[in-house]
């Protein structure tokens, strides 16, 4: 892995180390954290936590959470531990494969599991090994879903962000095991097709599916400066660390 650099998140509230090149978490991780309906005192596991951006953004927003992360790549797991320590966040970071979880995780149950599974299927090359592992799946999306559901307590919540063209695959994986599905499309600009979606499902839930209006990230027709271009809602999430109220509780 190339030398890491520190990036500010939530308006500088967090200072998190990530590789200078290759896979780096950004707005998607912050959006994932904002959508998780966790409450103080609950237990949260992130699958594929990388350097811990989503997990620690969630921990910064909701006090008193019991945080755990699972990361395949040792270098990223090491950065997550460093980030937790330097930002004063208590978290247990485990290095291992979600298909064969470490025994310490297999013995636990969580109120929430969050994940940003690889966006691309296997077979597409990436120039950087770390980026390739993070962005291109070696474990099928359905296995991510099953692994997350196994770690949830009954009635627990699974929160996932994924590309919109894999939404059908994700919903099929949830069928029969989780319900009360809520889908929040994420569009770059008003009137544009959504490129991402956050999907939240409850283990054992029976409520009907809900499709929400898109969350729009940018105001202007073309991209200029992030700080000026973000919608008010996106500013509140990305810069101020606010949550996204999806009406789940």
Residue map of PLM features:
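Conserved Class I SAM-dependent methyltransferase catalytic core
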Residues: 21, 140-194
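Conserved SAM/SAH cofactor-binding pocket of Class I
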Residues: 34-127
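Residue-level signal for inorganic ion chemistry
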Residues: 32, 116, 144, 201
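Class I SAM-dependent transferase core
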Residues: 1-39
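Conserved beta-strand segments of alpha/beta enzyme cores
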Residues: 15, 66, 90-92, 179-182
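Mobile active-site "lid"/loop adjacent to the S-adenosyl-L-methionine
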Residues: 117-150
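SAM/dcSAM-binding transferase cores
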Residues: 193-249
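Short, low-complexity, intrinsically disordered N-terminal peptides in bacterial proteins
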Residues: 1-9, 86, 223, 243-249
């Amino acid at each position: 892995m190339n030398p890491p650099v520190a990036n500010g998140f939530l308006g500088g509230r967090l200072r998190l180390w990530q590789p200078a090149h290759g896979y780096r978490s950004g707005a998607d991780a912050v959006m994932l954290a904002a959508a998780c309906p966790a409450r103080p005192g609950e237990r949260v596991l992130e699958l594929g936590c990388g350097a811990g951006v989503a997990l620690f953004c969630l921990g910064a927003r909701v006090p008193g959470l019991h945080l755990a992360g699972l990361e395949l790549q040792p270098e990223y797991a090491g950065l997550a531990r460093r980030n937790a320590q330097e930002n004063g966040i208590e978290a247990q970071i485990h290095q291992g494969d979600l298909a064969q979880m470490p025994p310490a995780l297999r013995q636990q149950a969580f109120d929430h599991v969050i994940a940003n599974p690889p966006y691309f299927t296997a077979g597409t090359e990436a120039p950087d090994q770390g980026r390739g592992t993070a962005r291109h799946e070696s474990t099928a999306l359905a296995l991510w879903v099953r692994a997350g559901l196994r770690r949830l307590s009954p009635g627990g919540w699974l929160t996932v962000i994924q590309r919109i063209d894999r939404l059908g695959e994700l919903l099929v994986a949830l069928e029969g095991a989780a319900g009360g599905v809520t889908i929040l499309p994420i569009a770059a600009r008003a009137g544009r097709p959504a490129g991402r979606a956050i999907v939240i499902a409850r283990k054992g839930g029976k409520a009907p599916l809900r499709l929400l209006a898109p969350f729009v990230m940018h105001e202007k027709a073309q991209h200029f400066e992030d700080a000026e271009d973000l919608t008010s809602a996106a500013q509140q999430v990305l810069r101020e660390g606010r949550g996204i109220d999806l009406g789940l509780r």
